[in-house]
Amino acid sequence: MNYEVNKSDEDWKKELTPEQYRILRQKGTEMAFTGALYKNQDKGTYVCAACGAVLFSSDTKYESGSGWPSFYQPVKDGVVDKQKDSSHGMERTEILCSKCGGHLGHVFNDGPRPTGLRYCINSASLKFQKE
């Protein structure tokens, strides 16, 4: 896919922390229950740590028990891209930032109403902007 923000690996390595680079650019996953934003309950907006695109609102964040920040929907349609992920012997749907292609996490069909979806997102993929 072509993304609005398109940088070389060298540039991403300069701009991101090693953990952010591993997750956002190499499709890594942080350990459950360790992310800085996992327990965050402040009101505000969650943006892509790589490009600053607005992705999720605290209004749709909920405690899923998964160990990662979980949301039942993005702030609006089109801010995340979905693609099939068959890694690690599993069939999942990967979530990417639609502006820079950064790996955010995965979406599952076991979330609460009104969507029934659980966007399971790595804390390192996000930055929080408090209201």
Swiss-Prot record:
GO terms for molecular function: peptide-methionine (R)-S-oxide reductase activity; zinc ion binding. Disulfide bonds: none annotated. InterPro entries: Met_Sox_Rdtase_MsrB, Met_Sox_Rdtase_MsrB_dom, Mss4-like_sf. It comes from the Bacteria. Residues 9-131 form the MsrB domain. Binds 1 zinc ion per subunit. The zinc ion is important for the structural integrity of the protein. The active site is at C120. One of its GO terms (cellular component) is cytoplasm. It is an enzyme of class 1 (oxidoreductase). Its cofactor is Zn(2+). PROSITE patterns: MSRB. It catalyses: L-methionyl-[protein] + [thioredoxin]-disulfide + H2O = L-methionyl-(R)-S-oxide-[protein] + [thioredoxin]-dithiol. Zn(2+) binds at C48, C51, C97, C100. GO terms for biological process: protein repair; response to oxidative stress. Keywords: Metal-binding, Oxidoreductase, Zinc. Its EC number is 1.8.4.12. This is Peptide methionine sulfoxide reductase MsrB. The gene is msrB.
